[in-house]
């Protein structure tokens, strides 16, 4: 194994989870997880087939402890208002990435609803919440809708016949926690607008809808396969 990678892991595990070390801890975690494939290959021996996963688990535990530390400044972060059109375009692009191997197009029908949160967190959370439904519904016309409010996050997925069989593949009630966990991993706590403003997007996944805006993206299946990235781990309700 490259000595530099071992050095980074050792350095990370030696740091105390304090506000003073927060920047270095996050930087090291990102660097280590960016080389996770390399770590798996180099530790996948007959004697220690799980060594790489254990190392990454230790690194993630360090990040969780930092996120749960009351002294950390990330507990007090907030996000400014973002433009709805730009936010929704990002959601469309990322969702289309999930569908690119099926050669399907994504259409978006906008609704003017205000939102006060970080756009990248909404994009990541939406991708996670509907990815399973999309993955197991290839070849169907699916409609996915996401509603985020001050106290709730609800995801609904239906097929072209109006049946909600795909809904069983996701857990709507865990949505808000998933969003919050992602926010914590990215250095903040998601705070919705105090007046209860919410974000709502209705999307239709089809190749022949008569209206809407069409977006294209190249194949990106490796994103879904890399379940050990900090973002994916944070989205799976694994935070303490």
What are these regions (language model features)?
Residues 155-174:
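Glycine-rich/acidic phosphate-handling loop/turn and adjacent ATP-lid/helix
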């Amino acid at each position: 194994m490259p000595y530099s990678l071992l050095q980074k892991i050792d350095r990370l595990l030696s740091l105390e989870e304090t506000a003073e070390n927060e920047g270095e801890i996050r930087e090291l975690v990102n660097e280590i997880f960016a080389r996770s494939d390399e770590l798996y290959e180099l530790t996948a021996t007959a004697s220690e087939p799980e060594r790489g996963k254990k190392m990454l688990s230790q690194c993630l535990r360090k990040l969780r402890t930092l996120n749960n530390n009351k002294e950390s400044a990330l507990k007090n972060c907030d996000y400014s208002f973002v433009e709805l059109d730009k936010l929704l375009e990002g959601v469309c692009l990322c969702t289309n990435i999930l569908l690119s191997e099926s050669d399907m197009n994504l259409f978006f029908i906008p609704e003017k609803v205000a939102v006060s949160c970080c756009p990248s967190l909404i994009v990541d959370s939406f991708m996670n919440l509907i990815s399973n439904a999309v993955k197991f519904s290839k070849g169907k016309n699916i409609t996915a809708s996401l509603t985020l409010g001050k106290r709730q996050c609800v995801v609904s997925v239906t097929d072209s016949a109006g049946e909600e069989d795909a809904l069983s593949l996701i857990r709507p009630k865990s949505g808000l926690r998933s969003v919050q966990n992602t926010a914590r991993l990215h250095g903040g706590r998601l705070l919705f607008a105090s007046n209860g403003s919410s974000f709502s997007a209705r999307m239709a996944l089809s190749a022949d809808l008569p209206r809407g805006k069409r977006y294209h993206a190249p194949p990106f299946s490796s994103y879904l396969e890399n379940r050990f990235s900090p973002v994916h781990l944070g989205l799976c309700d694994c935070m303490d």
